[in-house]
Amino acid sequence: MARYKKRPTIQPGMPGLFDDFDDSLFTSADDFPVHPAIEKEAERRLAAEKEKRERMLFDDGDTFSPLEALPTIDRLKFISFGSGSSGNCAYFGDDTSGFLIDAGVDMVHVVDELHRNGIDMKTVKGIALTHDHSDHVRYVYAFLRKYRHMQVFCTPRALNGLLRRHAISNRIKDYHHAIYKEHPFTIGNFTLLAFEVMHDGTDNAGYYITNGAHHIVVATDLGCISERADFYMRKANYLMIEANYNAPMLAAGTYPEYLKARISSDNGHLDNEVTAEYLARIYTPALRNIFLCHLSKDNNTPDIALNAVEDALRQAGVTEIGDCSESPYARMAPVQLMALPRFDSTGLITLRLK
């Protein structure tokens, strides 16, 4: 049954909708006298409402404010579990989320180290792969099978290379999150962007990573520093860069000539002097931590790599260089430098902007 609204009754002599009328004939509500007690109560309520609004905007307590700024994350967490041809894996995280770069180190060792440093695997959201060589992917499927909440982030070409090169179940595709170079994606609280690096793997990638004001760059396994790699590495506050070999040691070593040529090619690995000269050229006070990674077991030593980089930085005017320790003296240095161990964990390293 249709419902109808009753038409209002129009009284004779009252103005119509479009008629002009003298509003001075009507008395406003503001013109009526107000009892002093009512007026006082209204003033009290207005004052209380004003105080409540100010408390919402400026109070540091638990009161919610729609204009309250998000908390600033002033430090990040970093652990390297191993870096070199025997296996590569590293962790970046904040207080609530994190991820792994590569999965070439035994899963049990990685998980034990994370737990020892108070990091729950539930907060480790995924694995970002740099390329498909075995020292970077050997344990990736083991992680995914045990921790079903995790995903593997790599380009489709890198995933195809991984399946082609290694005896890994096709079910890894169920955990694959496809990424594309120069297109940002997120893992937890981090934004990552993969960029092209020169190496002889399949669709090799470096990573430019941000979390608030923190800028991280990972550039491992690259034979030369391309324009895109240079573009992103200059943005870094924390830089993981390869220093694979000492050129005289490689030349005098026992490797066959074809392998020496492969290592020293533009699609191979970086030697200490190239890395050192490059770091001296791009250094600014914004660069807080330098991690030398993927040192060769046969053609390099940590001391040789560190000395090459330290000498280049000092020639560029950097007089104080810390060692990534928590000692007050080391923390006062404008830049921290460390050669990542080949087989061991670094322990938890705190990354600070100040």
What annotation goes with each model-predicted range?
Residues 3, 227-339:
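Cap/insert and terminal regions of metallo-dependent hydrolase folds
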Residues 4-6, 11, 18, 23-41, ...:
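Conserved beta-strand hairpin/beta-sheet module of binuclear metal-dependent hydrolase folds
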Residues 100-104, 124-133, 153-156, 217-221, ...:
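Active-site neighborhood of phospho(di)ester-bond hydrolases with catalytic His/Asp-centered motifs
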Residues 133-137, 160-161, 202, 225-227, ...:
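Active-site environment of divalent metal-dependent phosphoester hydrolases
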Residues 138-148, 164-166, 300-307:
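Metal-dependent catalytic neighborhoods of phosphoester/phosphodiester hydrolases
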